[in-house]
Curated annotation (Swiss-Prot):
It comes from the Bacteria. Keywords: Amino-acid biosynthesis, Aromatic amino acid biosynthesis, Lyase, Pyridoxal phosphate, Tryptophan biosynthesis. This is Tryptophan synthase beta chain. Belongs to the TrpB family. Its EC number is 4.2.1.20. The beta subunit is responsible for the synthesis of L-tryptophan from indole and L-serine. The gene is trpB. Tetramer of two alpha and two beta chains. It comes from Methylococcus capsulatus (strain ATCC 33009 / NCIMB 11132 / Bath). Transmembrane segments: none annotated.
Amino acid sequence: MIMQDEIQPYDLPDELGHFGPYGGIFVAETLMEPLEELKAAYHRYLKDPEFLAELDHDLNHYVGRPSPIYHAERLSRELGGAQIFFKREDLNHTGAHKVNNTVGQALLAKRMGKRRVIAETGAGQHGVATATVAARLGMECVVYMGAVDVQRQALNVFRMKLLGATVIAVDSGSRTLKDALNEAMRDWVTNVDDTFYIIGTVAGPHPYPAMVRDFQAVIGREARRQMLEMTGRLPDALVACVGGGSNAIGLFHPFVDDREVAMYGVEAAGDGIETGRHSAPLSAGRPGVLHGNRTYLMEDEDGEIIETHSISAGLDYPGVGPEHAWLKDCGRASYVSATDAEALEAFHILTRSEGIIPALESSHAVAYALKLAPTLSSDKIVLVNLSGRGDKDIHTIATREGIVL
């Protein structure tokens, strides 16, 4: 166990991509040079005023940032505890937080002379966000998606195709996000000269976990400023769903040194942690190596990856970003979980109390906020990251509830 004060958060990752014992680079030799090229380009352009100005312009005028903070007064009143606020990432162009990252990585790809971008996707939001920026920049786009997710996220598959992307359904393994990521990595190994891999979460080999975090940290920077303007102080607690964990790290990172602000990451408990049918490696997993980095994983006794389950395609992943693993071990963040049933209940409660239809991923965060807020006094503030909108999930929910559309 790492003590909370041993490592300062802004010193991480180190030059080799480590967050304490997590992260790093565990890839085939053929990918070492492309990763070094990417790291050098990222560090160069992160200090380039022209790149940063273009990024800011696109976030403001294309994505629609800053996303607003919304005080859910009716919901807060009905719960009878802390005041609940939402960071409205669902209002971004494409409907989720994913576009914050794809805009940044696509601009990098353009400057690095790449003509083709590839991506993996689970819920389809990262695929849509990648296809969107590829269309805008005139780049070829290929998206890998597990065959199970292709079925349950048919709307987003059609959106990607409308945007000009080629969507490849992956039939291997559990046919979900893990397998899509495997195939995307294979594509990149084969086509490194002209292809840029836009990873959608804070996982993968260094520099991806840090780079995706830095592009998503606009969420937390804005939220920090907005909460100070609206309430005169910082929130008492942050709540965000965690699959790979990019929306959560995006919110958490600018608050890490504010020790008075509690941080809660909400994993997908699926049918219940005790059933084994879940996607909660921080709650019930152990450290191992997957997709180029060391982190908490869902493994069996032989070190084989266990098949995951969640009603939410975007949380249906057996690993988690290495920075979350470090935040768990050092005690700075707490990781909890919500079941499919709890997420569905939260989906309906938020929809009917505030007129906001959240994504099933975001509904896991809402579910925990519904538990947390009543335990706190009315002068406390809970800020929930509403990472995406729920249009994409309507058919999944209708089918589960026996409704034919």
